[in-house]
Amino acid sequence: MADLSAFPITRKWPAKDPSVIQLYSLPTPNGQKASIALEELGLAYEAHRVGLDDANVKSPEFLSLNPNNKIPAIIDPDGPDGQPIGLFESGAILIYLAEKTGRLLGETPADRYHAIQWVMWQMGGLGPMLGQLGFFVKFAGAEIEDPRPRERYINEAKRLLKVLDTSLEGRDWIIGEFSIADIAICPWLNGLAFYEALDLVGWGDLKNVPAYLERFYNRPAAERGRNIPPM
C-alpha cells in the first residue's frame, strides 16, 4: 500500500485507496480536462471534490499541493522511479498522464510536439480568453458599464475560434488523431453555452467547431468525465 502521508492534502481529503491516483478537482473546464484524461486512459483514480471557496482552495492542505490555489491537482503514488509525485496545472497533468501511459500524444515525435503545441495554445489563449469572456458576460464583470473589456474578450474569442475552425478543416481531431490537445480544448468550448455567449462569438457561423465539440462529448469517456467529481 502506497504511503501518501508526506502530502498534507490527504489530511483534509483522505485517500480511500492510496494505491491509485488521487484527483482533487471540480468539473469546471480545467477540472474536466483531468477527469476526462483519466477516463480516456483507463487509469485507476479517486476523485475528491474541492470547492472553489477559500475554505477549500486556500486551505493549508490544498496549498501544500498547489500553491496557486486552483483545481485540478493530482497525486500519483506510482510516479517517476516508482515514487509518489504531486502535480498541479491542468496542462502539465495532461502531458504527464499521456507520457505515463504512452498514449494520446500521437504516433510520432512530430505528433507529440503538435499535440503539446495545441495544449499550450489552449492554456495560453483559449482558456484565459474564454474565462474572461465569461466574467464580463455572465458574472460580476457584466455589471461594468464600460463596454471595452467585454468587446475585447468577445473579439478575441471570435479570433481564437476562427483559428481553431480553420485548423480543423478536413480532420476530426486537431492533430489528426485524438489526443490530449482535444481534451484540453473541448471543455473550454463547452463553457461557452454555460456563459450564454454562443451567439456573441458567432458559434453558428463556424464550419467545423460545433461538430468537433459534439464528436468529443459523444466519446463515452468524455461523457463520464464531464461531471467528476459531481458538482
Task: List PLM regions with ranges.
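GST-like domain detector, emphasizing the conserved glutathione-binding G-site
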Residues: 1-151, 174
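Residue-level detector of family-conserved "landmark" positions at structurally sensitive sites
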Residues: 48, 226-227
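Short, solvent-exposed turn/loop segments enriched in Gly/Ser/Thr/Pro and often Arg
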Residues: 51, 180, 229
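Phosphate-coordinating loops and pocket residues in cytosolic domains that bind phosphorylated ligands
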Residues: 64, 218, 227
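Residue-level recognition of oxygen-bearing side chains
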Residues: 92, 208, 221
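Active-site-flanking alpha-helical
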Residues: 98, 188-189, 226
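GST-like fold's C-terminal all-alpha helical module
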Residues: 118-218
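Carbohydrate-binding/catalytic loop surfaces
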Residues: 139, 230-231
